[in-house]
Design a protein with these regions (language model features):
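Membrane-proximal helix-turn-helix segments that form the acceptor-binding/catalytic region
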Residues: 17-36, 43
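A short, active-site helix/loop in glycosyltransferases that binds the activated sugar's phosphate group
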Residues: 33-56, 193
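Carbohydrate-associated surface elements
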Residues: 42, 60, 69
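Conserved donor-binding/catalytic core segment of Leloir-type glycosyltransferases
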Residues: 77-95, 100-104
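Nucleotide-activated donor-binding/catalytic signature segment of Leloir-type glycosyltransferases, i.e.
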Residues: 82, 116, 122-147
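Nucleotide-sugar-dependent
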Residues: 95, 143, 147-148, 155-177, ...
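Conserved acidic donor-binding segment of nucleotide-sugar-dependent glycosyltransferases
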Residues: 197-206, 213-220
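A charged, aromatic-enriched C-terminal amphipathic alpha-helix characteristic of glycosyltransferases
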Residues: 217-250
């Protein structure tokens, strides 16, 4: 395909693992690229045999949208009593819902929001839906998401089997940080949390539940400013400025 295109320079932006495709596809693209952007150190290391010109540009988030303090409480949340803990993202077939299911059953007085399209093939989805304190809701527009997250007491990050072994920080995390709310995430057995000073990292459903309890007991404003600052540093405008600087330095 590249042979059929006319271009002055070739840039490859690698933001995910493509191991499900023939490896020579990405290898040939990386070899041909004048400059490669990688979203994580792991991806950069993976691509390094094929390029000596790789720049690390992590994912980012829309900080201005998720950091606003004037967002309205969505109608479906008006009647909720008690703490609200929310997950933002698709409930895919390989999303591990076990930590959420365990915590929802342990705390029937808490509310859990799953904000995204739900795949019926997920093996725990029916059991999660059966919990009276869990709401699975597909949003009509992503523009609604900041309103929902603004009124969550804790933001939740769950694991997808396809991401096992990857070190890519999803944009979801930066959106969570931009709200300033406590964040509780599941971690793989050998995974190191990227933001250990502001995110609670769990390795089992039981520890996930305990850390949700700690997050809800967190003193207001304790580290919310630090979380927002991490979100601000990862704003897409900052990422774009860094890309522009790298391109200018490289002479593109």
């Amino acid at each position: 395909m590249l042979d059929a295109l006319s271009y002055g320079a070739l840039l490859y932006d690698c933001d995910r693992d493509w191991s499900q495709y023939p490896i020579h596809w990405e290898s040939e693209l990386t070899l041909a690229a004048d400059l490669v952007f990688a979203a994580s150190a792991g991806l950069a290391d993976h691509l390094s045999p094929c390029s000596g010109n790789i720049a690390l540009i992590p994912n980012g988030g829309n900080h201005p949208m998720f950091s606003r303090d004037d967002l309205s409480r969505p109608l479906p949340m008006l009647d909720l009593e008690g703490p609200v803990l929310g997950w933002a993202g698709a409930v895919s077939a390989d999303l591990d819902l076990a930590p959420l299911l365990y915590t929802a059953r342990a705390h029937p007085d808490w509310n859990f929001l799953l904000l995204g399209a739900a795949d019926p093939a997920n093996p725990l989805l029916d059991r999660v839906r059966a919990c009276p304190n869990v709401i699975v809701r597909q949003l009509d527009s992503l523009l609604e998401l900041p309103d929902y997250l603004a009124w969550c007491d804790v933001c939740l990050n769950l694991l997808r089997e396809r991401d096992n072994g990857l070190d890519i920080v999803p944009s979801r995390i930066y959106e969570y940080l931009s709200t300033g709310h406590p964040v509780v995430t599941m971690l793989w057995p050998d995974q190191v949390e990227h933001f250990p000073d502001v995110i609670y990292g769990a390795h089992s459903p039981e520890s996930f539940c305990r850390l949700c309890e700690q997050a809800l007991a967190e003193a207001p404003g304790w580290v919310s400013g630090r979380r927002r600052n991490y979100g601000r540093q990862a704003a897409w405008s900052h990422r774009a400025a860094e890309v522009d600087r790298i391109l200018s330095t490289a002479g593109f």
